[in-house]
Structure formats: structure tokens, C-alpha cells
Amino acid sequence: MIDRPMYLNQLSRAVRRSPITALVGPRQCGKTTLARIFAKEKTTTFFDLESQPDLNRLQNPQMMLGSLRGLVVIDEIQAMPELFRVLRVLVDRPENKTRFLILGSASPDLVKNVSETLAGRVEFVELSGFGLHETGTGSANVVWLRGGFPRSFLARSDGDSLAWREGFIQTFLARDIPQLGISIPPPAMRRFWTMLAHYHGQTWNASELGRSLDLSDKTVRSYLDILAGTFLVRQLQPWYENLGKRQVKAPKIYLRDSGLLHALLNLSDFETLHGHPRLGASWEGFAIEQILQILKPPQAFFWATHSGAEVDLFFIDHGRRYGIECKFSETPKITKSMNQALESLNLTHLWIIYPGEHPYPLSKQISVWPMNNIVTLPKQFRYLWSTELKSEDRGPRVECFIPHFMSLL
């Protein structure tokens, strides 16, 4: 069992703040297990709507749920979409003190229904597969190769892990997509998903993908929306502003789980991964996902110009601008692109995430940071803030702050 304290803390805060908490994420990422651990020490009623006895208990949902107190957990809520309106009525009652934790199989419609029907009453907590802040950085290569899905990461061997991921892909195509009410032949979606794996880390170009697969732009867009809506693909949005430069305005596409990326590319071990032309892109996507899990910035972007300047990850908090570059190199160096990003975006600092062992500075504003030390990256933000504040204290006084995403750690 791998502890997941960060997500348990997020759930605890969300349940205190909101009458309804929605725990969302891809299938098989551990939502039910996390909910049971969270509910273990509380007065809890648990409903699993894939269980016929539990469905029978909810034949009159308003009467049943209205009589309960404490925490009520409803798993696979998409099996009874009428419950959304019932929950809205119940939590709007002045005397309501019940808290609801709802879980559902990843679905664009699920998130849409929850957001629309329960607007102002629900808080989302997004669960990912295991990250390095949970497994320990000593297992970084295992998480990178196998991905973060619990059964894939914990498999006895790389071969068993790959077999599980292949099974996940087959089940998603043959069962999960039809259960979403979507009619797409599994071979067609498999071809698209595999092609997307080859485009991992590149900007989205529907026309190019459509030509490769002999599909219309509209069709490939709908396929992408399915994978993004089920938390399997990340569309990293571009940052652009009036800089006097032609900037990229299409999103970058990443398969969120590196293990699924490697399965789709038929990369079974590190030898084949290290010899593959998508090695650098795989590293980039893996690093980005780990950073987003650890820092959880309110918003994250990439930035690029048509002349070649870019930064892989860019975010702003309380007026400070930060950049991340991901380089699969033992000796990363300052590039013209990095200097352009520092100047154009007015970055407070830029980090280069690399596979080496030790952190070190390349300049006052650029640091090299190892993946095996990535969980300590938040301390670097604290250090920067403290030194900035000391410097500013010599001039006009400024108010001390803790950036928003640090409050989530």
C-alpha cells in the first residue's frame, strides 16, 4: 500500500468547505481505494452503484439520502444521473449537515453534469496515478517507464506491467467508450491514440492528423475530446501576450500517463525507450506531469514563438512568473531560446529538469534540477521568495505572501 497523504488532505479540505465533493480522474487510478481510506474513521454510508443491492436501496433516493447524516460516499454515480438533481435539493435545505463524496468513471458528461447541475455546491478533487511525491524519487525510472496507474506500477515485472497496460487500453476501447454512449470502432480509436502517441509533446494540428488517418478535422477533434475528457490526454494551453512576436496559439498534446504512452509506442523496457526517437518527448511529458502534481499551480501553460523560442511549462502566481524546461541530457546548457524566454516573459526563475544527480545553477535566473530531487522543488520557491523579500525590504516595504499553489501542498 502506498500512502497518498496529499490527496487525503485535499479531500479533507474540500469536504469541510463544500457540501459535495467530486473525486475525479481516469479509471483504475485508485479513486475508490482513496475514498474508502478517507471514510474509514468517519461516520460514513457507502453506496456502490455497480452493486445491485445498493441500487435497490436508492429506489427512492431523496428519502434514503435525506435520512442520512455524516459522510455519504456514492461510487459510480454516473449509473444514476438523476441523483445530481436529488443532491442539489438535499444540500440546499437549511438544516442540511450531510457531506457527499461522489465518484464516477471518467467521462466528459459526468464532469459537465456535475458542473452544471451542482454549480456553487461542489468542489472537484482530481486524482492522478502515483507520482514521485508518493512512490519516492528512488523509483523515478520505474514510474517513468510503467506510468502511475497503481496496478501497472506495482506489477512484479516490466512484462506484467506492460500486459496490464495493454489490457487497460483494450478495455477502454471495447467497453469504456461504448459505456459513455459513444460509437467508435475500437480499431479506429486505437489508430488515433497510437498516432497521438507519436505526436506526444507537439502542438495540435487537426488537419495533419486527419490526413494521416484519412479522417476529417471534426472527427479527430472529437476523438481528442474523448481522451482529454477521460483524463488520458492533457491539452496544455499556450500563453501569449502582446510581445511583438508571432506566438504559437495551438495547444500542446501530451499523453498524461507515461506508461500508456510507452505501451502505445511498443516500448517495453528502458533499452527500447532510450533508443526511440520520442525519448526526449517522453521525458518532457513525464516531467511536466510530475511538476503539476507536486506544485498544482492554478493555471499552467507553455510558451513558444514561430521563430523557435519556447519554454515547456510556464505559470504565474501573485505576479511572479516561472518557467520550466525539460531536457534529457546529463549536461544541459543555457540556450538562446531560454534567454529569449527569460527576457520576453520576464521570468523570475527558470528551472531545467534533467536526469542527472545534482542540482546546480547555470546563472542567477537559471537552475538545473534533477528529477530524483523534484519533490524538493517547492523549497526552491520558498528560497526565492525569501531572498526577493529581503532584497525588496531595502526599498519600499512589500507584503509577504505565500503563493496559492503552495497552500495546496
Regions found by a protein language model. Name each.
Residues 158, 163-318:
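Accessory nucleic acid-recognition modules appended to NTPase machines
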Residues 357-390, 400, 405-409:
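Domain-level recognition of nuclease-like catalytic cores that cleave nucleotide substrates
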Residues 23:
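Hydrophobic anchor at the beta1->P-loop junction of P-loop NTPases
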Residues 34:
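Hydrophobic positions on the alpha1 helix immediately C-terminal to the Walker A/P-loop
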Residues 85-102, 116:
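Conserved catalytic/switch belt of AAA+ P-loop NTPases
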Residues 108-122:
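Short regulatory helix/loop adjacent to the ATP-binding pocket of P-loop NTPases
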Residues 2-14:
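Pre-Walker A adenine-sensing motif
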